[in-house]
Amino acid sequence: MQENQATAARENIMGTMDINPLLVKLSVPMMVSMLVQALYNVVDSVFVSHVSESALTAVSLAFSLQNVMIAVGVGTGVGVNALLSKSLGEKNQERANKTAQNGIFLAFCSFAVFFLIGLTCMRPYFYAQTSDAEIAEQGIRYLRVCSVFSLGLFLQTMSEKLLAATGRTYLSMISQLIGAVVNIILDPIFIFGYCGEALSGTTGAAVATVIGQFCGAGSAIFFNLKKNPDIQISFRGFCPSAETIRRIYVVGLPSIAMQCVGSVMTFFMNQILMGFSATAVAVFGVYFKLQSFVFMPIFGLNNGMVPIISYNYGARDPARVKKTIRLAVCYAEAIMLCGFCIFQFAPNKVLSIFAASDAMLAIGIPALRIICPHFLLAGISVVLSSVFQALGNGVFSLIVSVLRQLVVLIPMAWLLSKTGNVNMVWWSFLIAEVVSVLLSLGFMKRIDKTIIEPMER
């Protein structure tokens, strides 16, 4: 009886509530959650920058592999989110429960992989990017802790996706806040040596991060067990389902690959910029942390949008699908406009947060001003990427991402670097985004003809 009431309540929200307030209701908590998630990336760098520029560069070089961990966790969660929402839309409670169980199992599998990577691959990873032993050793200490103790990251990410898929985004937001607050409190305590020299600097930043992740994971697991009646999580007699895992990764793998493409991009961009100076690498690392405050709210918007689209796709309601897409694009563009204004008119203010030296300001101020116009185009492609995933066409998202970040961005950055002017390298972002938007619009036209329009018949 309780299960039927929960399903009926969900149908009232996802299937009948007006799209605009529904999208706001589901997205705003996730947008706050994503902004909080951005703090995980930024807070470490802010405090570490007050230790030394070499420590900041080390954390910047760590970002590529760190982003792969996040990609695996989030991408798997995206697949679980889409399949779980679609199952509930189709009133298939058994498949919804099985999806949740297999999602948690995959979180443990992901941890096992990165545990081994953390023990074996840190040294070659850093020395492939820099010959500066001081930078490399600080990076090794930081990333080894983050990977060996990554279980908190994967459990937190998966548990929050389960909450989001069932419309409980405010609980996901609370778990994010818990983890971030713990991280922010512990960061200066560890980084500046108040817990001993062995746990100071970049090592301390990593320790604070993983403790925050475990706290966030614990709260998210609690909320799923006690506050989420739409799914029943029990591992009594559990056996991994190859079919369920396959369906999760039909959507999830393109998302993982798409984010991993970003890691490959940052790895090679660091190589290109290192040809100018370590300061240029630090500036790029700072830019990536800062732009997360612009893009993360849109990722949160997408997390609220995806279950609405997936649910109404399962319920065959094309009008609600179309309206959700239109509103999401409008909100995304408004957010991107705000980000553009901040980067264009106050770059020195945002760079000063990272104790930027005169050399960093000389490179960073023109860099932020040249890069930020691509924000105005990126809002469209980022939203459409999640639309493709929600409608079971995640491969389109992957194609767009690979084209933008590898086929166009890196070759253009390399060619422009041959001018000997680091400022020219930053124009590659705008060039790549123009190509990305054009391709995304082409794919969306195809999706409309093959998936959305047939639902109207």
Segments from the language model and where they lie:
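Short runs within selected transmembrane alpha-helices of multi-pass transporters and secretion channels
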Residues: 77, 146-164, 172-180, 205-220, ...
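Small-residue-rich hydrophobic transmembrane alpha-helices
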Residues: 56-116, 153-172, 283-347, 378-400
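Short alpha-helical transmembrane segments in multi-pass integral membrane proteins
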Residues: 1-27, 84-151, 197-253, 309-374, ...
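Structural signal for membrane-spanning alpha-helices in multi-pass inner-membrane proteins
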Residues: 118, 161, 187, 191, ...
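Helix-terminus/linker motif at the lipid-water interface of multi-pass membrane proteins
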Residues: 35, 39-57, 126-133, 189-200, ...
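N-terminal transmembrane alpha-helices
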Residues: 14-46, 50-51, 67-79, 83, ...
